[in-house]
Amino acid sequence: MMLKYLVLFIVLSISVHAQNYPQFNATVYDSSGTGYYFLVPIKMGPQGANFNPYHMILDSVGNVVYYKEFVSGLNTGDFKLLSNGLMTYTYLNKYYLMDSSFTILDSVNCKNGIQHDGHDMQITANGEYLLMGSENVVMDLSSYYLFNNNGSPGSSTASVKAVVVQIQDVNKNVIFEWHSKDY
């Protein structure tokens, strides 16, 4: 008898913990819509340190169908459904790929010293990864008079974060790299 109550208590505790997602209001303007909404709220700046980022999928009327919380102070993003049916998100300098049961199948990140940029990742029809990255470069911006809201010239040794687009094959070998600093 005691074992039955212990099992019931454990099951109830787990289900209560699973409902630990933040409260929100969903206003539905057109109930004829179908589909799902992928949400990734983030906080920027010092106040973000006490915020637990999360992924959430809502159905067309605002019911939670998926929720995953991440470590406080570390942002996640770009949570989406790809055209091949996989879901992807960025976290800790990688993109993770999940199937429809939310099982992580693989991860991919930029190579050749390129820094991870979590703004976009796509997979082509033939399985190649298109990744967005960045690199820090020093540039002479002294001929540009756009700075400090008063037309001041830029620095001759300005530190600039430049975009890099990287394409990797199915084995994650870099097959193409485009550097915005070159254009």
Predicted regions and their residues:
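Sec-dependent N-terminal signal peptides
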Residues: 3-14
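Histidine-/acidic-rich catalytic cores in large beta-rich domains
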Residues: 18-183
